[in-house]
A protein has these predicted regions:
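Short alpha-helix capping/helix-loop boundary micro-motifs
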Residues: 61-75, 148-163
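Viral virion structural and adsorption modules
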Residues: 216-249
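Short beta-strand-centered aromatic/proline hotspots
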Residues: 49-54, 84-94, 168-171, 177-194
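Surface-exposed beta-loop interaction hotspot
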Residues: 84-159
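Loop/turn positions that initiate beta-strands
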Residues: 76, 165-170
């Protein structure tokens, strides 16, 4: 390598253009600066440890999460941080320097039986849904339901939740409640928070009557439609079988 080639290599170490040079220097600056910032944390993103910056907002259950330069964050990812689960619900498409997303604190572990007859569970966000229309249909007429029996659910899109549809039932309540409330999905909006097949679904559910097919102990609706309910074992009578004859001496 000649002197001129060595010179060219040195001046192009940060890029061939002025823009590339500016970008490289900014990425180096952030990599050196972020670990010293109080917003710098180590979180578990989709079961993988990742160093990120987490910035507070006016809402305590909403944060901004920023990746290190050269790393990425996916819309719909589940983040474990500060002994809580958080769901990434929005992502800035401009990832030139870093990935910037909004994440919300999860408050419910949804449980259901998937089409392959396997019990699934996934963290989601449950909110009051009285401001939404339920999307119910009755006698081919659109029905607007009033009252306080609606909830909104935000959940990550994946191969299992993509199959959720109108009429799917779930038990959604405090996990320690003995008799959990049942809800049916009435507004399966699947395009409001997904981009390039990544992101979150935003559903509206209406309270319905619980049935004998619901397993309140496990928190799974329609559980006994798929799995047999355990039969109560009959205790033998002290007097013996009803067919047994007594003999008197």
């Amino acid at each position: 390598m000649g002197i001129w080639d060595s010179y060219q290599q040195r001046i192009n170490i940060f890029g061939d253009t002025q823009r590339d040079t500016t970008l490289s220097r900014e990425q180096i600056r952030l990599r050196n600066y972020l670990p010293k910032n109080l917003s710098f944390h180590t979180a578990i993103v989709n079961d993988m440890e990742q160093q990120v910056a987490i910035i507070n907002s006016d809402n305590l259950n909403e944060k901004t999460i920023i990746s290190l330069p050269g790393e990425d964050l996916t819309n719909g990812s589940l983040v474990r941080w500060m002994d809580n689960y958080w769901l990434i619900t929005e992502k800035d498409a401009n990832v030139t320097v870093y990935a910037k997303c909004k994440m919300l604190q999860c408050n419910h572990l949804l449980k259901w039986v998937s089409d392959d007859k396997v019990v699934r569970e996934q963290w989601c966000i449950i909110e009051d849904g009285t401001k939404y229309l339920t999307g119910e249909f009755e006698d081919r007429q659109f029905v607007v339901t009033r009252g306080d029996s609606r909830i909104a659910m935000t959940i990550a899109r994946n191969e299992y939740t993509v199959n959720f549809n109108r009429g799917n039932r779930f038990l959604i309540d405090d996990p320690d409640s003995k008799h959990k409330l049942a809800y049916a999905l009435t507004k399966p909006l699947k395009l409001g928070g997904t981009y390039n097949n990544q992101g979150v679904f935003k559903f509206v559910l209406q309270e319905v009557t619980a049935t004998d097919d619901d397993n309140h102990e496990l928190g799974i609706a329609d559980y006994y439609k798929i799995f047999e309910e355990p039969q109560e074992q009959q205790q033998p009578s002290d007097s013996g079988s009803s067919n047994e004859k007594k003999r008197w001496l």
